[in-house]
Every structure is written in structure tokens, then in C-alpha cells.
Amino acid sequence: MQTVLAKIVADKAIWVEARKQQQPLASFQNEIQPSTRHFYDALQGARTAFILECKKASPSKGVIRDDFDPARIASIYQHYASAISVLTDEKYFQGSFDFLPVVSQSAPQPILCKDFIIDPYQIYLARYYQADACLLMLSVLDDEQYRQLSAVAHSLKMGVLTEVSNDEERERAIALGAKVVGINNRDLRDLSIDLNRTRQLAPKLGHGVTVISESGINTYGQVRELSHFANGFLIGSALMAHDDLNAAVRRVLLGENKVCGLTRAQDAKAACDAGAIYGGLIFVPSSPRAVSVEQAREVISGAPLQYVGVFKNADIADVCQKAAVLSLSAVQLHGSEDQAYVNALREALPKQVQIWKALSVSDALPARDYHHVDKYIFDNGQGGSGQRFDWSLLQGQPLDNVLLAGGLAADNCVQAAQVGCAGLDFNSGVESQPGIKDARLLASVFQTLRAY
């Protein structure tokens, strides 16, 4: 145990002694009630578990979230999480034990106290502040310390997340009878990340152990792939860095998915309820799903999606005017717009409005060499055809700025998701007729995307 971790643990010992003086165990031990939220049970089940984390700062990134409001964060996490992790280390993570009761009152899930725990006092303190589980790190503790600390936790009906980061610690975790083992993909000795650690260590943990992959999980593609090795994930920084926390959680759990061709407020609500991030409004007069600005306003009133206006060889002034009056998040170009058009559009649009470009895929992948284009839509033909192209063309390509479109529905969306694009763009496959979305089909598609 050297470098960063050793320094943190040395400082933690000083902190514990000071806190014991300030808040002696005898002053609150009699008020401690056993936990009634069962951490181990919460992570069981057919679906992959998610421990979502409240984290203001970290040693590797500094401050991650300026407007850190634990109650608000928990109120969003409660819709998605199996358990909620709360950083309580003050010096390195700007955490606090005071965050634990706030989160516990804001969400019904078990609350994990995430700290560098080296003394039974910290576990009593965590339970007093309403934590239902605690982190014990084998990189910090010897076997005797671990046994003592986990016995204290279990005596308070708290769960233990046992963290390992190499083969030796993995073997110790098995010998110590750990029920839930977190594999930290970050090396706390030098703060580097390696997702291969989950792939290497998880298969050797054996049956009966719940495996949680921690650190460095940023995308839906990583989650889908690593879910073959792990029973769940602990995710913090990837979410905390985004202003729109709801969208950030959906991006990782479901992908950056869009429902296009919205014409009714109720369909926008159904798309949002199901799990979409983006809603598409088509301003191409020849489309059966075309809407006016007034209709678009009505659609937008239905749900707080991020709205994308779809245009085809439109006048730049018209695109900018609609983007402004509707507060669009992005404009999507579906015609033969060239680089000069994109340059002029970028100059005229507010900088927070992204530019997306749809590209038609037939028997080869088109180049993605536009400047000032934030995302690409790969579709078959001009869009709205309901036909798919040959997805095998996408193998081995970097696709983190691509949405996949064309004939997507419940029967092929998992296969589409496995291609590795940032997200999927649904339209005709979730409709009962052109422009009329079917809430049951929408729910079915997103349930299918979350069935891992």
C-alpha cells in the first residue's frame, strides 16, 4: 500500500481519532437501531444491479459536481438504483456523514457508506447516520481487521461491500467469505483505470458471490459487455459530471436513445417515461410526421426530453429560428448539406445547440469527416423507411458519436444495441400508424434494452 492510498489511510487514522474526541461512541451507541434495508437482498435478482453514487469530488478529478445537492440526486437515483452509495470522506472527496440521513430520507434503497474504514467506530457512526452497508477495502485491511469490522457491520444488520483490486485480494475475499465483492478497476496506488481487471478477476470468484464492477464505467456499451462478468456496477463520476443527471443515468443504463417523429404530447411523455433521452421533431414538409412550430410546442409540453429538430436542405435562417423559439438541444440534417452549409449553420446557431448529420449507409460506411458535427445518424436511405442496413459493416468501428436508425423495434433492438453505437433512433418500429406512437411498443423496447 503506497502513494495515494497510503496517504489517504494515514490521514483517515488522524480523522478517526479527532472525530472520537468530538463525538464519542458512548454518546450515541445506545441510539443505534439495526438496519432494516437489506443491502444483500437488493443486489439479488435476474437483472444487473446498479449502485449509483453521490460524489462531489475525487482525488483524480477534483470537484466533479459544483451544485452538489444529495437530496435532489437521491430523488433521481431512486428510479434506477438497487442501492445508493454516499461518499463520506471529507478531505479527499468532500463528503460528509451528514449526507447519509439526507439520502436515506430521499430514497427507499439501502444506503452504502463509502469511506476508507479502518476502525469499528466508523461503522457505528455510519449506522447512526442511517447507512445500511459499508465498504471494506482489502487493500487497506488485513484479514483480522476485516473479520472484526465485518462482524460489527453484520451485528447492526448492515451489508458489506468487500473491495478487491488484484488476484491476492480476490483470494482473500473468498477465504474471508465475502458475500458481495467489488472489483475496483481503478488502481488506488496510481489512480489508473483498467476494465480488464473485472474480466480477469470476476470469473475466479466462484458461484454464490455477487460481483460488482467499480470505477471507469461510462457507457451503455461497457455495461452490456461487462454484465457477462459482473452482477452489477457501482457508478459515480460518469453521472456526477453531467448537469442533466436523469439523462446521464439513462445514457449508461439504456443508451443515448431517441424517439423520432413525435407529433403528440402524449407520445413525448410515453417516450420519456419509457427511458428515451431525445425526442425528434420533423420539420421536413414531405414527411408524414412533419410538424409545425405550434404542433412542436404542444409536443414539447408533454415531457422534458432533449428535443432534436430534423431538417432537410432547409434555409439556415429557418433552422436557427426554430432552434431558438423551441429551445432545441440539437438540429439534425437529413439532406445533402455540405461542409460550407454546416460551417454557416454553426456560425449562426447558439453554441449550446448541437449539429447532427444523418448519413445513408448502403454497402459501405460513409466517411465521418465533417467539422462542427457533434453526432451522426446512420440510416438506410433517407430516413423513415423502416428498413435496416447491414450492421456488420459497423464491426470494429469507433461509434461513440453515432446513433443507429432504420427499422428498429423490440425484436431487434438488443442486437442493434450490441453493435456498439452511442444509442438507437426509434421511429416507425414504435408506431401504430405514421406519427402515432404506441406507448406499449415504446415500453416494450426500453424494457428489452434494460433486460440484462
Curated annotation (Swiss-Prot):
One of its GO terms (biological process) is L-tryptophan biosynthetic process. Residues 257-452 are annotated as: N-(5'-phosphoribosyl)anthranilate isomerase. Residues 1-256 are annotated as: Indole-3-glycerol phosphate synthase. Its EC number is 4.1.1.48, 5.3.1.24. InterPro entries: Aldolase_TIM (IPR013785), Indole-3-glycerol_P_synth (IPR045186), Indole-3-glycerol_P_synth_dom (IPR013798), Indole-3-GlycerolPSynthase_CS (IPR001468), PRAI_dom (IPR001240), RibuloseP-bd_barrel (IPR011060). It comes from the Bacteria. The keyword DNA repair does not apply. GO terms for molecular function: indole-3-glycerol-phosphate synthase activity; phosphoribosylanthranilate isomerase activity. Pathway: Amino-acid biosynthesis; L-tryptophan biosynthesis; L-tryptophan from chorismate: step 3/5; Amino-acid biosynthesis; L-tryptophan biosynthesis; L-tryptophan from chorismate: step 4/5. Pfam families: IGPS, PRAI. It catalyses: N-(5-phospho-beta-D-ribosyl)anthranilate = 1-(2-carboxyphenylamino)-1-deoxy-D-ribulose 5-phosphate; 1-(2-carboxyphenylamino)-1-deoxy-D-ribulose 5-phosphate + H(+) = (1S,2R)-1-C-(indol-3-yl)glycerol 3-phosphate + CO2 + H2O. Keywords: Amino-acid biosynthesis, Aromatic amino acid biosynthesis, Decarboxylase, Isomerase, Lyase, Multifunctional enzyme, Tryptophan biosynthesis. Bifunctional enzyme that catalyzes two sequential steps of tryptophan biosynthetic pathway. The first reaction is catalyzed by the isomerase, coded by the TrpF domain; the second reaction is catalyzed by the synthase, coded by the TrpC domain. In the N-terminal section; belongs to the TrpC family. Monomer. PANTHER family: INDOLE-3-GLYCEROL-PHOSPHATE SYNTHASE, TRYPTOPHAN BIOSYNTHESIS PROTEIN. This is Tryptophan biosynthesis protein TrpCF. It comes from Salmonella typhimurium (strain LT2 / SGSC1412 / ATCC 700720). The gene is trpC.
